[in-house]
Regions:
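Charged, alpha-helix-enriched surfaces in structured cytosolic catalytic cores
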Residues: 27, 54, 78
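Extended amphipathic alpha-helical scaffold segments
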Residues: 14-51, 62-69
């Protein structure tokens, strides 16, 4: 049976160890996180706020971990959705620490993009477009942070990063195209309230449409020959 008491993991590795030690099923993770937050509520001990702020970082890492699995299943998606709710509540309780966690991830993604572009935007081995885990993280940013503000500590660098992806990454495969289209959908969601125009997203959509039309035209000509 599921224990009622758990330690409060201070890192993602500690969280994975806890889940493995107690043989926690994906369907039980939401309950485990709820119990950890209850057992380590900030009003129960002076050190608990610090514990929960570290736990927040572990939960963010676990979302990326689940989304980045090679064989992501429906269980993983349910876990991600459950964890986003916990992250949202903890981010509202500790906004400064939450912002630090998110900005650190955004900075790392931007560094990886620059390193990939340095290899050459068309190099098949260059990591330019975000992977599934990174797309899940950007979606979480759009859901959790106010994207209509003129300037925001998390949302502004997120907007700039998505614009960089769309402006500088080049489509080399259908996977790249899917990443580009999903980024455009995130941009649309993020700018729905402010109604800002993002030229990088419009240009990316135009380029993708042109590529698809070219492929369709090529197949049509091949079929007639």
């Amino acid at each position: 049976s599921l224990p009622f008491t758990f330690s409060c993991p201070s890192s993602h590795d500690a969280l994975l160890d806890l889940l493995d030690e107690h043989r926690i099923e994906p369907s039980q993770i939401h309950t485990v996180v709820s119990r950890i937050r209850t057992l380590h509520a900030p009003n129960l001990a002076e050190e608990n706020p610090v514990k929960l702020q570290r736990f927040l970082g572990a939960l963010v890492d676990h979302v990326l971990y689940r989304a980045g699995q090679q064989d992501t299943k429906a269980d993983d998606l349910r876990v991600i959705n459950d964890l986003v709710l916990h992250i949202y509540e903890l981010a509202r309780a500790y906004p400064l620490r939450a912002a630090e966690h998110f900005v650190a991830k955004i900075s790392l993604m931007q560094h990886n993009l620059m390193r990939g572009l340095a290899l050459g935007a068309l190099d098949p081995n260059a990591r330019t477009w975000p992977r599934l885990s990174e797309l899940a993280f950007l979606r979480m940013c759009v859901l959790l942070w106010p994207t209509s503000d003129k300037w925001h500590a998390v949302a502004t660098p997120m907007h700039l990063l998505m614009a960089q992806y769309l402006a500088h990454a080049r489509i080399r495969s259908l996977r790249d195209m899917a990443s580009g289209l999903y980024l455009c959908s995130l941009v649309s969601s993020a700018q729905r309230e402010s109604r800002r125009i993002v030229p990088e997203a419009l240009n990316a959509l135009f380029n993708i449409a042109a590529m698809l039309l070219s492929l369709h035209h090529g197949k049509s000509m091949h079929g007639r020959s």
